[in-house]
Design a protein with these regions (language model features):
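Two-component/phosphorelay signaling modules centered on CheY-like receiver
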Residues: 16-26
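Cysteine-nucleophile active-site neighborhood
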Residues: 48-117
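C-terminal and late-domain segments of enzyme folds
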Residues: 145-210
Length: 210
């Protein structure tokens, strides 16, 4: 199974690539946003700032949105989750627009939000068991997603008195504000559960063919 990380050119993606490859996936880095779509799983990583990342994504923004809306499996981490939204107060440029809403600055005295925090499932919208979220995960960010409505939110977290989505899901796209690759064994289990779910769906489609 091919897993492609979109490289915005902003940092070292080694730890994330290593965590994904540990499950036997063929992990590749790609700087051409259009080329990232020739994959089984697209990963929008959590390294960088919104403006430069949006600029890197811009040449294929609509193609990426259409592919995700059509069901291409995608994992979007931290900044990557923020890129699923329409735009951000952090910088110029457009996000993918898969999730209606914007990204805003954290409303907290201590910014950035760095360290371990709880991930609380959002009741009826909680992720399926194959995508069990870690109960505690590692966060590192100064901006948070503000969806127009909560239907796609699968988990929440709170920093001081500021509550915001810890995870969202639309079609086969899962966005998480935390860093799974930095969230110990539970984070790695989340990554492997996501890849296992993609494999299972692909296998089911294959067995259903005449």
């Amino acid at each position: 199974m091919r897993v492609t990380l979109f490289d915005y050119g902003a940092g070292n993606l080694h730890s994330l690539a290593k965590a994904l490859a540990g499950d036997g996936a063929d992990v590749r880095l790609e700087r051409d946003p259009a080329a990232t779509l020739a994959t089984d799983v697209l990963v929008l990583p959590g390294v960088g700032a919104f403006g430069p990342a949006a600029a890197a994504l811009a040449p294929a923004r609509e193609r990426v949105r259409d592919a995700l809306a059509a069901g291409l499996p995608c994992l979007a981490i931290c900044l990557g989750m923020q890129l699923l939204f329409d735009g951000s107060d952090e910088g110029p440029g457009l996000g993918v627009g898969l999730v209606p809403g914007r990204v805003r600055a954290l409303r907290a005295r201590r910014v950035p939000h760095m360290g371990w925090n709880e991930v609380r499932p959002a009741g009826d919208g909680a992720a399926a068991p194959a995508l069990a979220l870690p109960p505690i995960a590692y966060f590192a960010h100064s901006f948070a997603c503000a969806p127009d409505d909560d239907r796609g939110v699968t988990a929440w977290t709170t920093h001081e008195d500021d509550r915001f989505p810890a995870a969202v899901r639309v079609a086969n796209t899962v966005g998480v504000q935390f860093h799974p690759e930095k969230s110990s064994a539970a984070g790695v289990a989340f990554l492997r559960g996501l890849l296992a779910g993609v494999r299972a769906r692909a296998g089911a489609r294959g067995s259903a063919r005449p």
